[in-house]
Amino acid sequence: MSHIFRDVVTIGSLSFNDGTIVNGSTYRCDLLDGWDDTAEPRVEISEFGYSDGVRTSDRFPKKELYLEVGGYVKVSSRLVGEQAKDLLATYLDVNSTLRITRQGPIPKAIDVRVCSAVEFPQDVGEAFRWLVRVMAPWPYKISPSPKAITAVMFSGIDYYRTYTDSAPYYRTYVNTSPYYRTYTSDTSVSSTGGLPNLVAITNDGNADAYPIIQLTGPLVGRSWELVNESTGESMTFGLDLGSTDTLIIDTLQKTAYLGSQAVEYYVEGDWPHLQPGANILRVLVGVDNPDARITITSYDTWKR
């Protein structure tokens, strides 16, 4: 059983343990059973065995995580108590999707789906207990707020001539192929930001994070490549983006949307992830696109 230590807990838009009085009621959360559990693998067995090249991890996806969440509410009257129960039943409705955030020494959050009706196992008039069961499809904890870093995209050397020796990230130009131009760089000075063609982002957790990648045109299909230099992953995309087009790639769900249209079948290569620690993502482009942008949005991710 996870001990709460009176940490402030937010479930959806309801706050617990923060000392505020809402309509004559004080809301407490003292039970987060399962919060400290780590993700377990779901074993998939095939009677035909596995073919060459199949990654073992693909056959052992992570199980969902179940939690029991509960606490108590102090009320000024039985009438206020009934109103508080109605409020909890409304906000903790069955099959609703909520985010649970615990403000501890390291604030963490988890997205859950309510899988039972809220229960009130004990009621003494001036206070009552509440209990609800939830399921987290993605069993890892994330930071309450994401990191979002944007970089612009250039290919030609003329842009980098504006940099002096005081900014040595792009001093040496290397034309390694007729399609993709790359640059040698000192990225130590860009550990938390976005530079032309490059995003340096840190995952401060201890589990792999899966970012949302947003690309804004104009970009010519197959004229660019997204590379995570820290993991060796590479992704190309065979679709033109106009100046008003925005492509959103979800690397966890492995989906890509151009507006409301699913276009993940244009993706070739790897769906990149962010390993714990520093990650360097670089866009290699063959055509100058000063109006094009890439934004990487990611949460720090923990195993527990």
Segments from the language model and where they lie:
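Polar/acidic, low-complexity leader/linker segments enriched in S/T/G and N/D
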Residues: 1-46
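A general secondary-structure signal for short beta-strands and their flanking turns/coil
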Residues: 62-66, 95, 107, 125-129, ...
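Short beta-strand and beta-hairpin "edge-sheet" elements
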Residues: 97-144
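Intrinsically disordered, low-complexity segments enriched in serine, threonine, and glycine
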Residues: 148-304
